[in-house]
């Protein structure tokens, strides 16, 4: 049974987004998100998977599907969203349209490849580790990498905040 669930946080996120009132940015943001999710859905269809639910929340869109028949099919579905974003970036850049839409596409593609479980890259790493004789070790290493990324981003954010306050 296919269902669509819309969380309150999705509506709240949209309200905040519309405060910016830059219609172009809003359109480009949703175009990038839509293309990303269509990439997942196309791969799901091509690999014989079945869509079960789409959930919209303030932290993103989650697609729940039937379990992948094998790791290759699961990987194809997980990587197809970021691949569409990166392909869109390449096409726009090579055609001379390296503006905001291209930048948003690149950012979405790279962001979704980060090794966090709620993102495509992390879900792929978790899927590859599952059932491995070294699963606990792999998960521990991934946890350390995730903490490292958070610390680096936090330091970068603090540095940027200090620079903008000093200017």
Q: What are the functions of these language-model segments?
A:
Residues 1-167:
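Hydrophobic transmembrane alpha-helices and their immediate loop junctions
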């Amino acid at each position: 049974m296919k269902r669509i669930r819309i969380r309150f946080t999705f509506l709240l996120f949209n309200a905040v987004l519309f405060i910016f009132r830059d219609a172009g940015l809003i359109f480009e943001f949703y175009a990038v998100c839509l293309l990303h999710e269509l990439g997942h859905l196309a791969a799901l269809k091509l690999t014989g998977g079945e869509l079960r639910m789409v959930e919209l929340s303030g932290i993103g869109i989650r697609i729940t599907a039937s379990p992948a028949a094998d790791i290759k099919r699961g990987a194809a579905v997980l990587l197809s969203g970021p691949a569409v974003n990166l392909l869109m970036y390449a096409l726009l850049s090579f055609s001379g349209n390296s503006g905001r839409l291209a930048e948003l596409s690149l950012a979405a593609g790279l962001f979704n490849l980060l090794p966090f479980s709620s993102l495509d890259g992390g879900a792929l790493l978790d899927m590859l580790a599952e059932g491995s004789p070294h699963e606990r070790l792999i998960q521990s290493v991934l946890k350390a990498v995730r903490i490292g990324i958070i610390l680096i981003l936090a330091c970068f954010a603090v540095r940027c905040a200090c620079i903008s306050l000093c200017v």
